Amino acid sequence: MTTTPSGDQNHTFRRYEDDDHDVDAWDEVIFQAGWSHKCPTYINKTPPCQGSCPSGHDIRGWLQIVRQLEKPTGDMDWQRYAFNRATDANPFPSMMGRVCPAPCEDGCNRNQVEDFVGINAVEQFIGDYAIEHGFEFEKCETTSDKKIAIIGGGPAGLAAAFQLRKLGHACTIFDDHEELGGMMRYGIPSYRTPRDTLDGEIQRIINMGVDVKLKTRVGKDVPMDDVEKEFDAIIWALGAKSGRPLPVPGADAPNCLSGVAFLEAFNEKRLQIVAKKVVVVGGGDTSIDVVSVARRLGHITEVHEKDSTENVVLGFTAHDVASTVVREGSTVTLTSLFPIENMTAAEHEVEDALREGVSIKGSVMPLEVMLDSEGRATGLRCCECTLDGNRPVATEGTEFTIEADIIVSAIGQSGDLTGLESMDNGHGFINSDKFYQVPDKPGHFLAGDIVRPHLLTTAIGQAAIAVESVQAYLDDQELSKRPKVDVHHFDLLHKLSEWNLSPEEHEAGESR
């Protein structure tokens, strides 16, 4: 949300004087930060945008390149130079530019002046330009005799493979789907993550020399013991693909579904229509994706039982009946424990859902799933509530029922550890220490939602830390506490190498 400057603020701290708001060119709207002391050149401390990014993006660095304040050497164009800098920490600029909720923009100093720098838009431009012009990552020779297994081919697993190949390690990704991508492919609606662009960003990583074993589930198709024997280290990047059911009576009805399963069925093109009345419980980004998909799909009046929403989502059928009938709009309602303005979903996503015709009820808690004589859900009984911390407190006398043909729970998710029960911490996740190691299991490391469901950029950042821990483990080095001091390390040798320069030899004379 934009923070405006106070009325008595000296206008010399801003770009414009009062009543002078003309913009000469579009790039001034985005790239005016360097003209104010509010966004200085950070040397001793991390810029607030970078400090707010879980993946550790050098955001200030690639923005400077795009603004032509830092120029490449030789015949490299600035687009390639910006791409190299932007992908040093995050190999998915096009995807992140589209779907990341941009904590970097929340941390931007320009919020104290007029509005944040449009970081997401610039990152998407860099990523899209790279796809259009066929940019590849540098070829990496396998200089190590170590092999690392990565269990899961989502953003965390792919980011780990990217970092491992840069270090010269051989790595193999095991994934139980037909295609790589994880939540980027199966958890986010395809209209938000164009498949050709996603495929291009994934293929770039595979082309670095990553081995892939698809439709292979460790713990079922391949015993974990066999993986431990074949590989020198394992990174668990399983994701969190099991949705949590509603903790209310009746939630086990056949037409009560999870948001994760709903979106996966849509992204696999199995789900073509939805029921007439859809109720979604949540308040986060997943719930917004579910209600938006439901509104866009709509329903038809005559549906064979095999083509009902729950049968398609649960994988019992995949008939495409929608192409021969007329669609009608579905009534879609989203309930949240939080007031609408405090929902965890991105504000612009909530606004988009409202514009698409979704009804959102804030400060509402579910009490019971209403069932018919056959045990199917017919509605959700709710009441108004307040929050005591994160605990909802029902407001007496405010009960009401929302009619529903299907009810979707998008209140959280956990990992599917079937066949890996020894790794389960009892909550559907795997325990991790501060170095993203599995406690008491040497050679086992973690990254992504299997640690704790969070942002895609968080999973990418965790993967980089896990790879650092893998390297220390392979080198038999003791891991030291990661510094929390907000200091940006300027790697002079890396910069000289990037500019094709070498430190000159010199003799040290007397110094006083």
Model-assigned labels for residue ranges:
Residues 254-278, 284, 296, 369-373, ...:
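FAD-site-proximal beta/loop scaffold in flavoenzymes
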Residues 49, 53-56, 96-100, 104, ...:
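Short cysteine clusters
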Residues 2-12, 16-19, 31-35, 39-41, ...:
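Mid-to-C-terminal Rossmann-like scaffold of FAD/NAD(P)H-dependent oxidoreductases
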Residues 142-149, 199-249, 368-381, 406-408, ...:
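Feature captures the FAD/FMN-dependent oxidoreductase FAD-binding
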Residues 290, 304, 308-318, 447-480:
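A conserved FAD-binding loop/helix module that cradles the flavin
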Residues 20-40, 58-95, 113-140, 266-267, ...:
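Ferredoxin-type iron-sulfur electron-transfer modules in oxidoreductases and energy-metabolism complexes
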Residues 26, 48-50, 57-74, 112-120, ...:
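Beta1-alpha1 glycine-rich phosphate/pyrophosphate-binding loop at the start
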Residues 142-156, 274-284:
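Beta1/beta-strand and adjacent pyrophosphate-binding region of the FAD-binding site
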